[in-house]
Amino acid sequence: MKSLVKYIFISILGFAVSPVLVLNADEGAVPKERLAFFTEQQRRIASADPDEIKDAIDRLTYVKSKLGVRDIIAALRGTPNFPSSTQNSPVVKFYAAKALGRKGDVIAIDPLLAEYKKQSEILVERENKTRKIKDGVYGSDSLSSPYFFGEDDISMVLACGEMLRTLGTLPLTENSEKEIKQALIHKNFYIRSSAADAIYLAGKKETISNLPEILSHEKDAYAKISILSALAGLERLPNQNFKAVVDTLKDEDPEIRKKASEALVRMDLTLAAPHLEKAISIENDQRVLAQMREDYKQIQSFRVP
């Protein structure tokens, strides 16, 4: 027994002083070169350059490790004591929120809630920006926005919307579910839209009980199609909501048509294909057309057993 204890002690001692391993509370032994990577990203997140912070967030997002989650949370929080610091820029919070959704760690829930509450209180109903040809979120995996111009123009509204969507992808808690539902009646239309996205992403049918009533009172077209998309996407029934989504494919606003196309994919109904095919035949907005074609392929694939 004594020899066994001595062996274990020597093994632990040798492990602790190993020149190539460092102990970490979350992951145990971490190679020094790997720890150096995370230390470097910590340094970059603490910098005053939003582009450098964003790049550090991206690097931490795509590594198979939980070590970077708290650093991304730190980027989300920024520097509260220095409100004018570039570390608090909306673009940093936007990408930090998106990264936390991809990491999927529950320790991000409370920080996301706190930051969302703090930033969403000061938002107005709508930002009056001149629309440009390049309106719309870039990238096939992004949810559209009616006033997204480019990375330099990411607003706090967009950042708060991303926080809500990320909360929807994480396990719902009593507090997060309450906040998401409350956001459905927020004064800003994009926040209401993002709350609807979050409800859909959460995937819980029991959370849609009040959506029909909220839908009936919604006046903004973009928020309305987002709420309708969440409702129809969770129901997945060929009912009046399906018909309403199909009708929205004819809307004059290309952003609304794009959201309607996304809604049809969510419904997972092959009978949506002819309607989308007809919409594609007359669509003249290239971004919307690309989205519709991609959505049409997905709907067609539903027929394959």
Pin down the residues of each PLM region.
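Amphipathic alpha-helical scaffolding segments comprising HEAT/armadillo-like alpha-solenoid repeats
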Residues: 31-43, 65-82, 105-127, 139-148, ...
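Conserved hydrophobic register position within alpha-solenoid helical repeats
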Residues: 56, 96, 128, 160-163, ...
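Bacterial N-terminal signal peptides
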Residues: 10-19
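Alpha-solenoid repeat junctions
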Residues: 60-64, 100, 104, 167-172, ...
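Bacterial N-terminal signal peptides that target proteins for export
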Residues: 1-9
